[in-house]
């Protein structure tokens, strides 16, 4: 019996992101027409990507970003992020748009009285 390590790595990544963000993993997120988003929080739709072996670079596809934003909107989310790793068990990095970046900077500066 062969195992699909890519799915195992993906499931582990999704669980880690959900735990870190206080969200929940979406079951079968890519398997339905109007589904999507590997992790959902109260305010964020997160799509997760990772390689099956370590990489020194990782290309972000415009189609991923467009599909993510479309699916997020369809499900009532106004913020989305693409999470990726350079290796299956590595650190997660998050790609956000300029509006969310501005919100993040404003929030951090307000919290730190800057």
What are these regions (language model features)?
Residues 1-114:
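Catalytic phosphate/metal-binding cores of nucleic-acid and nucleotide-processing enzymes, i.e., regions
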């Amino acid at each position: 019996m062969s195992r699909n390590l890519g799915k195992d790595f993906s499931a582990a990544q999704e669980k880690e992101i959900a735990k870190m963000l206080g969200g929940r993993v979406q079951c079968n997120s890519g398997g339905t027409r109007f589904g999507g988003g590997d992790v959902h929080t109260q305010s964020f739709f997160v799509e997760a990507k990772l390689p099956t072996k370590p990489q020194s670079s990782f290309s972000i596809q415009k189609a991923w970003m467009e599909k993510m934003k479309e699916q997020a909107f369809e499900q009532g989310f106004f913020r989305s992020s693409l999470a990726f790793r350079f290796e299956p068990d590595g650190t997660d990095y998050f790609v956000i748009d300029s509006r969310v970046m501005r919100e993040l900077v404003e929030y951090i500066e307000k919290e730190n009285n800057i």
